[in-house]
Amino acid sequence: MEVFVTIEKAKDGSYWCQTETEILGGYLTSTGRTIEEAKENLNECLAETKEDLERRQMKKGIMMALALTAALTAGAQGTAEDYRRAAELPQKFAASQVSGWVSGVEWKDDSTYTLKYYSDPAPQQERSRRRPETRRTETKQGPQKLERHWMNEDDERWGAPVPSPDSTMVAYIKNDNVYVSQRDGKDERALSLDGTLGAYYSARIQWSPDGKYVAACRIRPVSQKRYVYYVESSPKSQLQPILHQQEYAKPGDERTQKTPCIFEVKTGRAVIPDNALFSNQYDLWGPEWLADSRTLVFEYNERGHKVFRVLALDAESGKVRSVIEETSKTFVNYSRHFRQNIKGDTQMIWMSERDNWNHLYLIDVASGKTLKQLTRGEWVVRKVLHVDEERGLIFFTASGMNKDEDPYHVHYCTVGLDGKGLRDLTPEKANHKATFNKSYTRLVDTYSKADQAPVTVLRTVDGGEPQVLAKGDISKIESKGWKAPEIFTAPGRDGKTPMWGLIYRPTNFDPSRSYPVIEYIYSGPGDAYVPKDFQSFNWYISSLAELGFIVVQLDAMGTSYRGKAFEEVCYKNLKDAGLPDRIAWIKAAAKRYPYMDIDRVGIFGCSAGGQESTNAVLLHGDFYKAAFSACGCHDNRMDKIWWNEQWMGWPVDSSYIECSNVENAHRLDRPLMLLVGELDDNVDPASTMQVVNALVKAGKDFELVVLPGEHHTMGGSYGEHKRFDFFVRHLMGVNPPKWSDLKKTE
């Protein structure tokens, strides 16, 4: 090597060379009779210096390693002792250990109630005197309709005869058509003749209040339903595997189409409306008659979820008009809407995000005009509980009304039907859970925070001082080492919008030590997920933290209750998952708490959280160093239609591909453990297996856990143990205790 900066000739005729070197942080000088000799001597000097330094560094490294080993021995993480403590936490910090913590309220009448406590003894189960169930059951009732799985679409073919308002007649479905007859079966008449297997009439028949009309939807079912097939590898009933099938519509699949039809009972006149206002259905709900016996109202959710209408069909003219229309460039969150008719069906209370915040509106049915916005402001109505027309009050829950409080806290409120007199019935700065009596004049309210023990009070709607009924006493669990999680806020990606979350620490926390960080993620969308109530034990987090981790959970952009724009970040972009906000939040926490080692950050989640945790190491592997993902909907084209088209839109386009963990699997450069239940009836297990296939083809190293007989799961105790070991190995850099050794200590 020839590195030098200066060559000069000395007075005695020799030459000297000088070079700057980073080895010693200074200069080396060498001399020689010739330039070549000086350079050679300098190179030899450099080599000797490097060898000497390497010997010294090796000696220093050995001393540091010995010191580190001693330190780890004194305060190791992920040890058998940590596992033992973690296993004890569910019982040690059980809710039953907190006296005065109300678990439920049962109103006997308007003034009498019973409180139930978590500390109450568990009720003894009554012994069953029934004979053991046999494989075959015979009844006198004949064939019965099988219980419908929650994933199955209701075909509306089943239904008992519907009596008329005066009980003299019945309407029913026969041979796919609408029939009426006297109650005794006489004078049977067909009101429709065009019903077929491929276009039949719904059994949900509606009589007009005056008995003049009946209404039923003509249904055009999908031409071919999609099914997911499962192989139950290890059934309890037999040795050989069992094949199961489950109806399972996916994004882009055909949808059932409905046309509300009206039949005049006396004349048989049919009113078949033009479907221009409801032609491209994701779904159609109703119909239902208004009190005037002339107007049939139904709700139309357009495919793609950008248009939602409340429509009215006139029984005389057959014309359809729009009473309410909601539109959005992204999505209308149809699962959040609320509608209730008041004032003899002449007005409707309607809930909408049309001004970016979820609020209540008063709508005139005849004109479709908005009469008044009943609530307004940069906060959200969460749920309408009760409408009392006599008192002119709407009872509802809300979040974000108080700017100096956690915006996710739930409060119970009332507002007048005229939009005046907004009141917060539960003013304490905490998360509230209340139960009203039947007349909505009193409520029992339990309020708490993640770091504040619960208090239960009795309130009156009219006001007055609340009566304290119970206070949670946490002294027992505190004496055993319980510590509340820390409520922590920090700006997200934009540098200004606060993100709210929790920081969990182990019971033996020592701020002088360094801790790996693990995030528990479920970013939805459709809700908020960070616990706001007091918890003595968090099932997925507390025991994991006890191994020697800092575990965090937060709600970031893409989740609910912070305004529509906050949630719309997810639109056609589920891969975002609020991860830029989460990374900023964790970095801010680590800046305040240097013991949080953000060079060792892991992440885990289930379902959507499974998709998001895998996505985190694929697209943000520079920050997230390991991921555990259970039952993930890794490719939104593979998951259920209703959840994915709501957030990813329709038709299925390139955004689905861009958000797919299958498409991005080749990016994996971090440890990843995938877990799936072979009978998952929520997320198609093939979603996980297709990621596995892509990882194998890309030559990536990963771990896979398949649980026989399990459904949508984080893996239970087995999955938890695998998750513990995974993070101990990859974030702590130590081998976890052998399972057999842990069993010996149990």
Regions found by a protein language model. Name each.
Residues 89-94, 141-150, 189-198, 251, ...:
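Surface-exposed loop and turn segments in beta-propeller and other repeat-based domains
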Residues 183-186, 265-268, 315-318, 365-367, ...:
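Short loop/turn segments that connect beta-strands within beta-propeller blades
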Residues 127-150, 194, 198-202, 216-273, ...:
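Predominantly five- to eight-bladed beta-propeller fold
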Residues 24-37:
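A short, exposed loop/beta-hairpin motif centered on an aromatic-Gly-Thr core
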Residues 293, 299, 431-746:
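Serine-hydrolase catalytic core recognition
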Residues 119-123, 154-157, 168-179, 193-201, ...:
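A flexible loop/linker signature enriched in serine peptidases of the S9 family
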Residues 90-121, 155-162:
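Beta-strand-rich domains and repeat architectures in extracellular enzymes and scaffolds
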Residues 105-110, 161-169, 204-213, 286-296, ...:
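Blade-terminus and WD-like Trp-Asp/Gly-His loop motifs, strongest in beta-propeller folds
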